């Protein structure tokens, strides 16, 4: 009897193994890197549709009016693009002298889309999401395909997975994608930085006119990024310093002497940024930390935000699904991926360095746009660190197989990860509709708050442009999660009210709240 039971168990085990192997072969034959890439591309693009759709109800607020007022008046009075741009340059120079040193950001904020009409503001989300997606994709494609000779479909899959987690779990979404002044200062300048890195790395593998063109582009971008928000500017300065040290230790400066120009112009922009007279004017009203304390506290904040707040199950999913993809990608490079712990530590230092400037300047990381930028860099660092570690592990095993197709086990694992993510996402969205950016957009579109907000803002514009000198507007009926940043107050002397007066040219504006 026992022998019969044992034979039955062995037969069942053999049957399960056989079916498992057959299923693995079926999945590996169906789930190829190419099909995975196209599937992820469709998913990512579809996930952006609600984000762009809700952008049709987006309207400017706060600094979009106060900082953008000079360019608005220039355009209304002259209808000249050149005069308007020149006015933005003059405004940036004035802010550099009297308020803040990031001259690139000053110019971008001085020229918001609503300069050319309120409805031009709908392009804000398109610009920010598009710039972030395209610049990140360009940089990572250069790293994966040109440096490490990875399969383009595997590289594309990694990029899309990273972008999905970055965009759909973004912190401070309204200030990252929908409020122009905040997004231009941080996300747009960060995107310039990604293009700068990508052009520099790509130029290494080019010759002749191609290299020259990319170095010229990198030089322009380097100067602009160095003059951008000080979080991105400092981060880039640290990365370039590490590059300079590596090249110096290898004594290869003769080989890369042409790269002095973009690097030098980057540091020129950075020095003009941090040494601006306006920084001292603003610092007089700020309560920041001393530099040493800011550095130490930034490491604590990096642990606190990255581990306690941002590293939920979506980030864990990202790491787990990237491991086999990077493992396959590492088969086509001879690079040995030395010292992975050192690379991970350097990545963590970069995330911490993002937090040092605001801690030094204002003593906190509370502004959502600061968290949005730091989160974006954090996910990038997690992705690259995962890839580097997976490559190191593969080289340790010394596997020479360069077949880029998925094995049965790998295909089953990837399929399981995708199904798990779908199931977990449904469980997360049901009780928390704003969990993902796309679910937040769908929620506000479906419940009508986005439409109500947009119609109320449209009615206000008609009042603003009616020619009245003392304007009174009603309270907004809704505050959509992705669209609402701030509003004018009942006090006509409030700074946002004054900025709107300057933008439209009337004497006063105030909010009239409904009696409850």
Report the location of each language-model feature:
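Individual alpha-helical transmembrane segments in multi-pass integral membrane proteins
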Residues: 118-134, 183-191, 226-227, 233
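Membrane-interface micro-motifs in multi-pass membrane enzymes
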Residues: 63, 152-201, 229, 353-387
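Transmembrane catalytic cores of multi-pass membrane glycosyltransferases
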Residues: 52-122, 180, 226-370
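Short, Lys/Arg-rich, polar N-terminal cytosolic tail immediately upstream
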Residues: 1-30
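Intrinsically disordered, polar/acidic, low-complexity terminal segments
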Residues: 15, 24-95, 99, 113-156, ...
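Membrane-interfacial entry segments at the cytosolic side of transmembrane helices
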Residues: 210-214, 250-264, 335-342, 400-421
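Short hydrophobic alpha-helices at membrane interfaces in multi-pass membrane enzymes
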Residues: 202-224
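Transmembrane alpha-helical segments
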Residues: 132-144, 192-204, 238-246, 319-326, ...
